[in-house]
Amino acid sequence: MAFPLKDDLGRAKDCWGCPSDTPALSTCSNADIFRRINAMLDNSLDFTGVCTTPNTKGKCEHLQDYQDTEGPAASRMLFSTSHEPLPRGLPDTNDLCLGLQSLSLTGWDRPWSTQDSEAGGHSSTPTAAQSVFSMLNSPMGKPSPLGFLTFDPIGSDLMEKYPTPLLRSSRLDSRSILDSRSSSPSDSDTSGFSSGSDHLSDLISSLRISPPLPFLPLGGGVSRDPLKLGIGSRLDQDHAALAAATVSPLGITKGWPSTSVWPSWDLLDSAEDPFSIEREARLHRQAAAVNEATCTWSGQLPPRNYKNPVYSCKVFLGGVPWDITETGLINTFRVFGALSVEWPGKDGKHPRCPPKGNMPKGYVYLVFESEKSVRALLQACSQDLLSQDGLSEHYFKMSSRRMRCKEVQVIPWVLADSNFVRSPSQRLDPSKTVFVGALHGMLNAEALASIMNDLFGGVVYAGIDTDKHKYPIGSGRVTFNNQRSYLKAVSAAFVEIKTAKFTKKVQIDPYLEDSVCQVCNAQPGPFFCRDQVCFKYFCRSCWHWQHSMEILRHHRPLMRNQKSRDSS
């Protein structure tokens, strides 16, 4: 029985029974063990041609046997070369090749007796390596049946015998190879091989196995290791090209975490920081405060001409006396109608109480029960007309125990300012929509659309996000009619807006929707990578999988704001 490969002329080769430089399996010394295993498996293994040729000098005599590790022994068990389907539970060719790929160690393309020398030649079977690699295109996206046990990774005994730099800085994690998402019967705990007896496991562990077939050699000027560039994460050709241009052969071990050859699983299983992605996503929402603007818009905001405006029942009160209390506010404004008070820090445990012992931050929100109360309040205010912008500011005089006749600013919100449609017949495409954060309170939807259209062009819609009282929450959405304008806006990221009344830096991100992970297509994808190398949705495990690579580790996640807009 043999593993058929094809030589350069397309003819089948037997890498276990023919004289070659390829390391061979020491089957002759294991014949009795194989017969006992075959008997336990109802003689399902084909031993034709096996153990008929002794390991004579000049063929495979120089190979050293490796019998200290159980994992490689199991992953290189004999299997039938016939075209009949394998017995239930036995590993097939794909499974065995998975084990080969996981062992991408220096010198596996040469006999072990010549690992430390430069004389070892590379294998002459590149087509076999390519075919094996093609079967491993995406272990996460294309479930493959895995019918063998999860054995321990190569241990310290191998590191002591062969202390190569890669071994010293690496650790093979079998879970990354064996974590298939297939629902195949051969994956289940009741499959034939997975539920084998302890005696069978003992037989397997006692096998004397030589090194595996050459696979993905790291030497010889190879520019990159396909395994380490994210097998299973479905990096497309653009990603692979970027990785090939960034990772050099000499620095191939430096581009990965020193604790694991297969990326991400240490990070995934980290008990110290299970919510690191969420924390980074929350920090990104305040990124405008610490990042420089890439472009600036300056000018006049569009004039506002209202006919019978309808207001939100919620108004902003700025510049309130520092010693004001909730009782004092209600007593002052209840002449206009029933109301409640919302203090800053509404996300805390007591949103309707002044923070830190009646020490407000200088502003507060009033929520009236009727829109008519807001109209009455505005009529009682003095107005400062801002002729250059067509805006007017409302001020109301109030007093506290220690401050007499203090003017506070009243900022209402007209409901018509929440949405602006430039082309009513244009269909709004979420994939061409951006999220704009850190908006100034004086920016309405029309002004936002005008600014974004001046900068990037193609704006067909702008909307301001509001809470349950239909009052702005400081963010908005802008939809474009073409992909180029959309990508320009996303690439800009931070834009500074300068007007006669205020200067504000806003933050632009892709608009996020509920989506499945675009890598595994199996789990929800709440995390989005805005970097154009990725630019897709990820589940937690796929995010760690892809972004554990050094060239992608600087990417920051985005998440939809989980805080309900009805929280107030």
From Swiss-Prot:
One of its GO terms (biological process) is cellular response to hypoxia. Ser-174 phosphorylation by aurka in immature oocytes is essential to trigger CPE-containing mRNA cytoplasmic polyadenylation and translation activation and the subsequent signaling events that result in meiotic progression. Ser-174 phosphorylation recruits the cleavage and polyadenylation specificity factor (cpsf1) into an active cytoplasmic polyadenylation complex. Ser-174 phosphorylation increases its affinity for cpsf1 and papd4/gld2. Heavily phosphorylated by CDK1 on serines late during oocyte maturation. Ser-210 phosphorylation is sufficient to target cpeb1 for degradation. Residues 172-175, 182-191 are annotated as: Necessary for interaction with microtubules and localization at the mitotic apparatus. Residues 181-208 are annotated as: Necessary for degradation by the proteasome. Residues 173-195 are annotated as: Disordered. Zn(2+) 2 binds at residues 529, 534, 547, 555. Its main location: cytoplasm. InterPro entries: CEBP1_N, CEBP_ZZ, CEBP_ZZ_sf, CPEB, CPEB1_RRM1, Nucleotide-bd_a/b_plait_sf, RBD_domain_sf, RRM_dom. One of its GO terms (cellular component) is membrane. Changing residue 547 to A: Abolishes RNA-binding. The keyword Membrane applies. The keyword Ion transport does not apply. Found in a complex with cpeb1, tacc3/maskin and eif4e; dissolution of this complex results in the binding of eif4e to eif4g and the translational activation of CPE-containing mRNAs. Found in a complex with cpeb1, cpsf1, the cytoplasmic poly(A) polymerase papd4/gld2 and sympk. Found in a mRNP complex with cpeb1, a guanine exchange factor xgef and mos mRNA. Interacts with cpsf1, papd4/gld2, tacc3/maskin, microtubules, sympk and xgef. Component of a ribonucleoprotein (RNP) complex, at least composed of cpeb1, lsm14b/rap55b, ddx6/Xp54, ybx2/frgy2, pat1/P100, eif4enif1/4E-T and eif4e1b. Belongs to the RRM CPEB family. Sequence-specific RNA-binding protein that regulates mRNA cytoplasmic polyadenylation and translation initiation during oocyte maturation and early development. Binds to the cytoplasmic polyadenylation element (CPE), an uridine-rich sequence element (consensus sequence 5'-UUUUUAU-3') within the mRNA 3'-UTR. In the absence of phosphorylation and in association with tacc3/maskin, also acts as a repressor of translation of CPE-containing mRNA; a repression that is relieved by phosphorylation or degradation. Requires zinc for RNA binding. This is Cytoplasmic polyadenylation element-binding protein 1-A. The lineage of its organism: Eukaryota, Metazoa, Chordata, Craniata, Vertebrata. The gene is cpeb1-a.
